[in-house]
UniProtKB/Swiss-Prot annotation:
Belongs to the RNase HII family. Endonuclease that specifically degrades the RNA of RNA-DNA hybrids. Its EC number is 3.1.26.4. This is Ribonuclease HII. A divalent metal cation binds at residues 16-17, 108. Its main location: cytoplasm. It catalyses: Endonucleolytic cleavage to 5'-phosphomonoester. Residues 10-220 form the RNase H type-2 domain. InterPro entries: RNase_HII (IPR022898), RNase_HII/HIII (IPR001352), RNase_HII/HIII_dom (IPR024567), RNaseH-like_sf (IPR012337), RNaseH_sf (IPR036397). GO terms for biological process: DNA replication, removal of RNA primer; mismatch repair. It comes from Flavobacterium johnsoniae (strain ATCC 17061 / DSM 2064 / JCM 8514 / BCRC 14874 / CCUG 350202 / NBRC 14942 / NCIMB 11054 / UW101). Its cofactor is Mn(2+); Mg(2+).
């Protein structure tokens, strides 16, 4: 069973991202502060849940959380600062958007939330000096497979996944030949074959290479 709290602080935030391994679409981050009393027997890592279960949990999390935030970082920014930095920046942005300032932050993964904090970029949000100092002032802990251990990270993973899926469903209508409604931008065989046939779109990440055995496609050519 997932644990509710890691640090002992009341305003503990869990944060996670979705879409890191995709060829198209944003990387989406979320942050959630759950109340000190919260129980849900279904809530788990979003990757372990069905689409139906995630859809069921999304409004429950939104209604019962003390606060939450979600943000998208789009391909132009991903291409500029790389996907790892974009993932961390998305989670940093989510912390800043929360209604309450967290007392402690737990992060899914093995990287400190403050890694590459304040990275300069042309696209997307630029952090102010005050925002950087605020993020530095909040203690944080990275937890490997945290979305399968702590409820707030699991809740963040579900919001990140569901909000991103909704976005991919929307842009599918513009470019249905890539079938983003089904593959959500991940490098399925069907998606790779569509890229080979139709080329890339404004929603594709141009910094991502497909290996030679993945239809010999190279975005840099």
């Amino acid at each position: 069973m997932l644990q509710l709290n890691y640090s002992g602080f009341t305003l503990e935030t869990g944060t996670d991202e979705a879409g890191r391994g995709c060829l198209a679409g944003p990387v989406t981050a979320a942050a959630v502060i759950l109340p000190s009393v919260f129980e849900n027997n279904i809530l788990n890592d979003s990757k372990q849940l069905s689409e139906k279960a995630r859809a069921l949990l999304k409004p429950i999390i939104e209604e019962q959380a003390l606060c939450f935030s979600v943000t998208h970082l789009f391909p132009d920014e991903i291409d500029e600062i790389n996907i790892l930095n974009a993932s961390m920046k998305g989670m940093q942005e989510c912390i800043l958007k929360l209604k309450h300032i967290p007392e402690y932050i737990i992060v899914d993964g093995n990287r400190s939330l403050n890694a590459k904090l304040g990275l300069k970029n042309t696209f997307g949000k630029q952090f102010s000096k005050e925002e950087i100092e605020l993020l530095k002032s909040i203690p944080n802990q990275s937890i490997i497979k945290g979305d399968a251990k702590f409820l707030s990270i699991a809740a963040a993973s579900i919001l990140a996944k569901t909000y991103r899926d909704e976005y991919m469903d929307q842009i599918h209508e513009e470019f249905p030949m890539y079938n983003w409604k089904q593959n959500k931008g991940y490098p399925t065989k069907e998606h790779r074959e569509a890229i080979k046939k139709y080329g890339t779109t404004k929603y594709h990440r141009m910094s991502f290479r497909l290996l030679p055995d993945q239809l010999e496609l190279d975005f840099f050519e």
